[in-house]
């Protein structure tokens, strides 16, 4: 199979990719540096079209674009598995929650279906010649979404 050709066929813009997100969806952003920077910006641009989108991440390294607008909490709710200082700022704005758990439990939440995920968006490495991507810091649990 020619993975590079298949990848090129599926490749789309961030603005087009985030059109799959609907009001009420759970969107998973991954962890730390895996947060989808470009997709986050595109999703924030759709803010006025959406209500009650629940976004989940952890150890946030930069303020997500979806959290920056004045009325962001009317459209998006941030849910953090583990809080960084940025996650705490989002929660203090009244638009986020902390999900208490131990990191070692995280794969089970996904494996057993306890973490609803309608849309998953994370940054990965470029595809290698075998068609593989690296989940990097999210590999302990994100791979369970695609198996």
Go through the PLM ranges and name each one.
Residues 1-145:
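Conserved alpha/beta enzyme-core scaffold
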């Amino acid at each position: 199979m020619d993975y590079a050709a298949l990848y090129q066929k599926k490749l789309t813009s961030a603005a087009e990719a985030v059109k799959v997100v609907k009001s009420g969806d759970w969107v998973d952003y991954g962890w730390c540096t895996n947060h989808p920077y470009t997709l986050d910006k595109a999703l924030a641009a759709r803010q006025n079209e959406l209500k009650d989108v629940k976004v989940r991440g952890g150890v946030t390294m930069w303020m997500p674009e979806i959290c920056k607008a004045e009325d962001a909490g009317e459209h998006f709710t941030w849910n953090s598995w583990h809080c960084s200082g940025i996650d705490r700022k989002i929660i203090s704005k009244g638009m986020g929650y902390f999900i208490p758990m131990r990191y070692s439990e995280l794969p089970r939440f996904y494996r057993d279906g306890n973490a609803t995920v309608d849309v998953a968006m994370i940054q990965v490495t470029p595809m290698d010649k075998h068609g593989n991507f690296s989940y990097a810091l999210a590999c302990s649990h994100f791979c369970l979404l695609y198996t």
